[in-house]
């Protein structure tokens, strides 16, 4: 499973949204109905899945599906 697929699966699981709604440009809060607690839990799930640490100042920048994919890809490089 690619990084993109794994990130999308985490988003579906964490936010309870349909896979087809998880588009690269989708905003977690505006498009997928997440609140601030959801986004914190999402970041924690990404950290656990990919065994990375995402500092708070970086986590604040992860607001869309694509930004999450990009961050994890860079962290795994």
UniProtKB/Swiss-Prot annotation:
Question: What post-translational changes are documented for it?
Answer: 4'-phosphopantetheine is transferred from CoA to a specific serine of apo-ACP by AcpS. This modification is essential for activity because fatty acids are bound in thioester linkage to the sulfhydryl of the prosthetic group.
* One Gene Ontology cellular component annotation held by this UniProt entry: membrane
Localization per record: Cytoplasm
Alphabetized, the UniProt keywords read:
Cytoplasm, Fatty acid biosynthesis, Fatty acid metabolism, Lipid biosynthesis, Lipid metabolism, Phosphopantetheine, Phosphoprotein
Query: Pfam families under this entry?
Result: PP-binding
Q: Which residues carry this modification: O-(pantetheine 4'-phosphoryl)serine?
A: 36
Listed PROSITE patterns: CARRIER (PS50075), PHOSPHOPANTETHEINE (PS00012)
GO BP: any one term: lipid A biosynthetic process
A single GO molecular function term of this UniProt record: phosphopantetheine binding
HAMAP family in the record: Acyl_carrier
User: What role does this protein play?
Assistant: Carrier of the growing fatty acid chain in fatty acid biosynthesis.
Q: Which family does it belong to?
A: Belongs to the acyl carrier protein (ACP) family.
Q: What is this protein called?
A: Acyl carrier protein
What gene codes for this chain?
A: acpP
